[in-house]
């Protein structure tokens, strides 16, 4: 009986040490930034997406009441 308890204890400690030794997830500390670019004419996806990709290496979406704002989201 004592051998069985020690075996379970050893296995539990081994599993716990393996779980604690696992590295943190990659990219867990990446932050997202958002920038609004005001355009002089109504926003189109053909204009907004390349603009955000060139300036910020991110994604773009047309927002605003009359789609006059291009909102860019990118990794800070």
Curated annotation (Swiss-Prot):
Protein name in UniProt: Defensin-like protein 163
Annotated family: Belongs to the DEFL family.
UniProt keyword terms in alphabetical order: Antimicrobial, Disulfide bond, Fungicide, Plant defense, Secreted, Signal
Signal peptide: 1-27
InterPro entries: DEFL
Gene Ontology BP, a term: defense response to fungus
GO cellular component, one term: extracellular region
Key word Repeat present: no
């Amino acid at each position: 009986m004592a051998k069985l308890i020690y075996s379970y204890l050893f296995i539990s400690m081994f599993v716990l040490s393996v779980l604690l030794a696992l590295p943190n997830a990659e990219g867990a500390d990446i932050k997202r930034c958002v920038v609004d670019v005001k355009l002089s004419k109504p926003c189109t996806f053909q204009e907004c997406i390349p603009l955000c990709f060139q300036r910020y290496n991110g994604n773009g979406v047309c927002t605003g009441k009359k789609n006059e704002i291009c909102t860019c989201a990118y990794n800070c």
